[in-house]
């Protein structure tokens, strides 16, 4: 399986994402610059965190116009796994690949610490390695993680089981309905504010994020039969 880690000007979590895939999973991964126009050679697309284009205008607002985003949309339409973490989630929202918007944290401060999440839906290609309602520890690092959508969209997210992760015990940023991560209706595009790539080794404080990446690999292996 081959992963693409999309690199925008200002990305700063691309190396962590690469490490999680290459060193922890042992899968093939490649950095892809933001002006790439073809992602056909990749099986999964990863949009890392950071401050793309300096977060000018608002987080993800400029990155959505990068050349690579047309290819990301094509990958999503083809059913490939697309994961956006933190700034990557914000970019997916701005690009219309996920519903809703991101606002400043309720306390108007940048938050950087581990939080607990509950796995709301473990029947997705990103969460199959988790147990239903499993509580996991994943770090956050953001100033604009306050997810918001209108009531109709929220009802649809709930009905379709598109809310994959919720904050558990404490909502650190004021996010609507404690939402920490959502998928699209098809279930192949996940956006989440917490950083699973920073929780892939117990030495880092938690290895709970590794199951997310393993879930992607397991899904791909189950749906791609390799014949000799």
UniProtKB/Swiss-Prot annotation:
Annotated GO MF terms: ATP binding; glutaminase activity; phosphoribosylformylglycinamidine synthase activity
EC number per UniProt: 6.3.5.3, 3.5.1.2
Locations listed in the record: Cytoplasm
Domain of life of the native organism: Bacteria
Major place of residence: cytoplasm
PROSITE patterns: GATASE_TYPE_1 (PS51273)
Any single GO CC term annotated in Swiss-Prot or TrEMBL for this entry: cytoplasm
Residues annotated as catalytic: 86, 195, 197
GO terms of biological process kind: 'de novo' IMP biosynthetic process
Keyword Hydrolase included in the entry's annotation: yes
Ligase recorded as keyword: yes
Pathway where it operates: Purine metabolism; IMP biosynthesis via de novo pathway; 5-amino-1-(5-phospho-D-ribosyl)imidazole from N(2)-formyl-N(1)-(5-phospho-D-ribosyl)glycinamide: step 1/2
Quaternary structure note: Part of the FGAM synthase complex composed of 1 PurL, 1 PurQ and 2 PurS subunits.
Name this protein carries in UniProt: Phosphoribosylformylglycinamidine synthase subunit PurQ
Native organism taxonomy: Bacteria, Bacillati, Bacillota, Bacilli, Bacillales
């Amino acid at each position: 399986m081959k992963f693409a880690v999309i690199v925008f000007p200002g990305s700063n979590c691309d190396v962590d994402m690469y490490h999680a895939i290459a060193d922890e999973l042992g899968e093939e991964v490649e950095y892809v610059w933001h002006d790439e126009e073809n992602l056909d050679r990749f099986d999964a697309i990863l949009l890392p965190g950071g401050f793309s284009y300096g977060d000018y205008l608002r987080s993800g607002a400029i990155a959505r116009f990068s050349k690579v985003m047309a290819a990301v949309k094509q990958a999503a339409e083809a059913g490939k796994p697309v994961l956006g973490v933190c700034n990557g989630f914000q970019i997916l929202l701005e690009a219309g690949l996920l519903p809703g918007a991101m606002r400043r944290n309720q306390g108007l401060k940048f938050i950087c610490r581990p939080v607990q999440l509950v796995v709301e839906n473990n029947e997705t290609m990103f969460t199959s390695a988790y147990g239903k309602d499993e509580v996991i520890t994943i770090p956050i690092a953001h100033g604009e993680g306050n997810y918001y959508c209108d009531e109709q969209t929220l009802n649809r997210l709930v009905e379709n089981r598109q809310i994959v992760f919720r904050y558990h015990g404490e909502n650190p940023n004021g996010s609507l309905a404690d939402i920490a991560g959502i998928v699209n209706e098809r279930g192949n595009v996940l956006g989440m504010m917490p950083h699973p790539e920073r929780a892939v080794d117990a030495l880092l404080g938690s290895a709970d994020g590794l199951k997310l990446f393993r879930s992607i690999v397991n899904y791909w292996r189950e749906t791609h039969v390799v014949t000799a």
